[in-house]
Amino acid sequence: MQNPPLIRPDMYNQGSSSMATYNASEKNLNEHPSPQIAQPSTSQKLPYRINPTTTNGDTDISVNSNPIQPPLPNLMHLSGPSDYRSMHQSPIHPSYIIPPHSNERKQSASYNRPQNAHVSIQPSVVFPPKSYSISYAPYQINPPLPNGLPNQSISLNKEYIAEEQLSTLPSRNTSVTTAPPSFQNSADTAKNSADNNDNNDNVTKPVPDKDTQLISSSGKTLRNTRRAAQNRTAQKAFRQRKEKYIKNLEQKSKIFDDLLAENNNFKSLNDSLRNDNNILIAQHEAIRNAITMLRSEYDVLCNENNMLKNENSIIKNEHNMSRNENENLKLENKRFHAEYIRMIEDIENTKRKEQEQRDEIEQLKKKIRSLEEIVGRHSDSAT
């Protein structure tokens, strides 16, 4: 069985950009369960270390007693969905495994990786090269198979894998990130197909030496042990995520029921408020109509008041005229009274003068009688 292929340098840049996109999208998914795979508290140690020693272009892979963990794939460096269920519904197709090529070996040999750089290695799970244009929904960790990639069998090259491992393995321990069961199944499928291809290749290839066979058998046992540990860790993490997700759903269901009851209460309250609002609207219309009627009556009363004011002003003018006439009459009365008094005085004066004249006439009559008597006596005496 061949070792899993490594991600090429151009795939490393693509994985880094996908990791930045996923970290930006993960901040917006607070209410959903995290799709990332839970890492164990203690890093899984593998009981071997690949020490690169090259002599005249040959690769010697030896087993060391000091266990140093090689870098394993971190699925969180790839853009994935927010729902963990989608990770188990669309596994990676085996044709996405990049077969070794001669130009890739040259490129990997000329590529100088930084000392502290971590390479994300996924057994039988990598993205296609950049030359293929793939369009799929965002946050989908398992993109559909593009039309340009054929469903071909996996052909792995031991020399290509060894060179890639020697050029990309860091010198320090890294944390182990486990894959979900769907990815393990796809990895098993890819490795089984790789075993079949190896059996077919063994017919034509020369028989390797004893050291290589020992390394292959020990590596196969270690890979089986590592795969079993990864499966157990992945199942445990999946159960934990499942329980957490179910608890989260139950909590959300309870919150939804509470919100639904509160919404029903608010609906009934809204209906009662709507009825009260309709009653208030009817009362408002009645008050508005009453105000309109009162305004019309007020206008009529204002008109009548204006008419009364006009009549009052007319009466006042007539009263002033009558008062002026009364004043004039008083003046005329005084004048008539004076004339009346003068006429009475004139009448009295006239009566007094007539009495004086009558008295004078009586005196004259008396004088005449006395004279007649005197004359009669003289005549008698003469006779």
Swiss-Prot record:
Using the UniProt annotation, give all residue ranges assigned to the region (Basic motif): 223-247
**Highest taxon of the source?**
Eukaryota
- Inducing factors: Seems to activate its own expression and that of the repressor ROX1 which in turn represses YAP6 expression.
Q: Which InterPro entries match?
A: AP-1-like (IPR050936), bZIP (IPR004827), bZIP_sf (IPR046347)
**Sequence ranges of Low complexity compositional bias:** 88-101, 185-206, 227-237
Quick check: keyword Acetylation in the entry?
no
Pfam family for this entry, one: bZIP_1
Name the UniProt key words of this record, in alphabetical order: Activator, DNA-binding, Nucleus, Transcription, Transcription regulation
bZIP domain ranges (all copies): 221-284
Specify residue ranges for compositional bias: Polar residues: 13-64, 168-184, 213-222
- Which PROSITE patterns does the UniProt record give? BZIP_BASIC
Q: Where in the cell is it found?
A: Nucleus
Q: Where is this region: Disordered?
A: 1-64, 83-113, 168-239
Leucine-zipper as annotated region, ranges: 249-277
Q: Does the keyword Transcription apply?
A: yes
Q: Which GO terms describe its molecular function?
A: DNA-binding transcription factor activity, RNA polymerase II-specific; RNA polymerase II sequence-specific DNA-binding transcription factor recruiting activity; sequence-specific DNA binding; transcription cis-regulatory region binding
Per the record, its GO cellular-component terms are: nucleus
**Which additional comment does the entry carry?**
One of 8 closely related fungi-specific YAP proteins (YAP1 to YAP8), which all seem to be transcription activators of the environmental stress response and metabolism control pathways and to have similar but not identical DNA binding specificities. Present with 1400 molecules/cell in log phase SD medium.
**PANTHER family, alphabetically?**
AP-1-LIKE TRANSCRIPTION FACTOR YAP1-RELATED, TRANSCRIPTION FACTOR KAPC-RELATED
What is the annotated quaternary arrangement, including any partners? Answer: Homodimer.
Family of this protein: Belongs to the bZIP family. YAP subfamily.
The job of this chain, per UniProt, is described as: Transcription activator involved in the regulation of genes expressed in response to environmental changes and metabolic requirements. According to genome-wide promoter binding and gene expression studies it regulates, among others, genes involved in ribosome biogenesis, protein synthesis, carbohydrate metabolism, and carbohydrate transport. It may also be involved in pleiotropic drug resistance. When overexpressed, it confers resistance to cisplatin, methylmethanosulfonate, and mitomycin C, and increases cellular tolerance to sodium and lithium.
Query: What is the protein's given name?
Result: AP-1-like transcription factor YAP6
